[in-house]
Amino acid sequence: MSQDKQLSLFAPISRDERQAQVIRAWAKANGRATVVAATGTGKTRIAMLIIDKLKYSNPTIHTIVLVPTTTLQEQWITELDQRGLLLNTEVFVMMGASKHNYKCDLLIIDEAHRVSSEVLSANLVNTQFRYILGLTATFERLDGRHEILAKYAPVCDTITMEEALFNGWVTKYKDYVVVIDVPDIDTYNSYNSEFNKAYEFFNWDFDKAMSMVGKDSFKNRWEYAKELVPNNYEHQKEMFKSITYYATSFMRSMQNRKKFVQNHPKKLEVAQEIIKWRNDKKIVTFSANVKMAESFKNGYVYTGKEGKKKNRITLEEFSKMPNGCLHSCKMAIEG
């Protein structure tokens, strides 16, 4: 453990000092690494400082920033412009950028855990870069695909929420677990049973199951059929049908479970009851989708459906209020 890290464990330090430690760790990793840092610890500022340092030694350095949403794209462009760093710096949305072959000196990936997905990982393959900086609060993915990012930009430093709270960089908070009993739990159990049967067919291998749907799925199902029943074409055809059936069942049941949990009306009912007894507070709710955010009876709604001007006005009005609610979805979470 470095001396800087030891000091940070025993005595409070400023956020600026900790960010300087992160930058040194990134430089020590030859400028090819990912920074894992809790929300509110200044990941964007770390990136800005790195761009500034590189531009100081090489004013013509070309930087590309990849972000998951247009909202973050706008925020990055605004902040880069305010800091005088927009020259020779481009900000692209990951999905669109994945279809192009770019070349740059420094590649910055915000919400870097996303770039390991099957589609977005093309950004890592297609982009030529000298340095790479990944920024994320959650490096590891449940599907294990974070190993893809780790090949290009392994973790060089981590700022945990515990460290941020200890040093007073973020506001203290409490987590409350609200257990919700739903009358139609049998429906969820049915979805779960179907999911487990399909998952078991693929030997509880998530990557294997996911490879049977989407891109190259036809080829992957045939290869799996030949692996399970080699040297018998007729049996392979029957196995292919079974694989297709269980792959479809796997995806369908997984989506059904997700929708059940995310959109259950009981969640809305309980949330509105909690809000009702806190009408003197300022409350922000985050929903999984726009429909759920719009289902709340009172308060402002902030989603991607409205134009940029309307969203800005909504945030400005909410920020001026002494109390009230702002209902949003992933757009505000990432903003």
Predicted feature locations:
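Conserved RecA-like ASCE P-loop NTPase motor core of nucleic-acid helicases/translocases
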Residues: 60-69, 282-289
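Conserved pre-motif I regulatory segment
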Residues: 2-34
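Walker A/P-loop
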Residues: 30-50
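Conserved helix-turn-beta segment of the N-terminal RecA-like "Helicase ATP-binding" lobe
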Residues: 56, 60-63, 70-91
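Conserved two-lobed SF2 helicase motor
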Residues: 84-106, 319-334
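Conserved interdomain linker/interface between the two RecA-like ATPase lobes of SF2 helicase motors
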Residues: 155-280
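Conserved helicase ATPase core of P-loop NTP-dependent helicases/translocases
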Residues: 74, 282-286, 291-334
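Post-DEXD/H (motif II) to motif III coupling segment of the RecA-like Helicase ATP-binding lobe
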Residues: 117-173
